[in-house]
Amino acid sequence: MKILPTLAEVKKLASDAKYNVLPVSYEMLSDFTTPIETMKILKNVSTHCYMLESAQANETWGRYTFLGFNPKMEITCMDGKMKIGNLKVKTENPSGYLRQILADYKSPRFDYLPSFTGGLVGYFSYDYLGYSEPSVKCIVEDTENFKDVDLMLFDKVIAFDNLRQKIILIVNMPLDDVEVEYNKAVMELKQLAELLKNGEKKKDPGGRLLGEVTPLFDKVQFCDMVEKAKHHIREGDIFQIVLSNRLSAPFEGSLLNTYRVLRTINPSPYMFYFSGTDVEVAGASPETLVKLFLASAHMPTAAARETLLQAVHH
């Protein structure tokens, strides 16, 4: 079992004070499973998991599919009440706490590993704008009760390399007691490989609608919004606006199979499946908006404005 980096290399890197964690990895062939089948295994051992992937413009799959489960910590905030693991604080600046957390997880980059080797996965709601731009008053009725932010800290990553037909298993180890933590990481990699090969899959309950799909606004209300938007455009108040009308329906089951179909019929640059404490999300979008890579932000030259998103509260 070839583990990278070696213990000797880790000891050398640990002497650099700017790092406090380090990704230890193991490669295996991927011909015995698929990302969806792997997700079924992960859902059998953890209710908290995610899948991130992309399809390129020529409809071939992007290079990496990332999966994670069993987060080390969950971080949420709603109405200024922030929960970091078991710690509860009241704050008007949750971003400050997030920066403090990320400061404790600085790791070196390795050319043989994908760009994402662990970190925070989750969502920021539109209401989060109130923390970063308090001058922007957006007073709307909260009909869904989503958290302002819900993030999970994943220190283990399963990366499908779709170009090389390999699976890269990654475990992030702290650098306070190098030899002990390295051996622990190696053991976790072995357990993770065994889980992927022989783990029991959670039976997919499927999903079905229990009632009619209804819009948030009826036709008269929506047309009134359109007329107001046209007025503000003519007045020069705005130059672009996206009017949306959420469709909702009672639902039972899981969105995993929905995501499985979605990634097939609508392969997109930005596709995601996320399962948390009280929400499950499956989505596909033609826009990645911003990708941060090696301290450089990359933005698409053109981005569409439509996003297909399905979410279920549990």
Q: Language-model segments: which ranges?
A:
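Extended alpha-helical targeting/anchoring segments
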Residues: 1-314
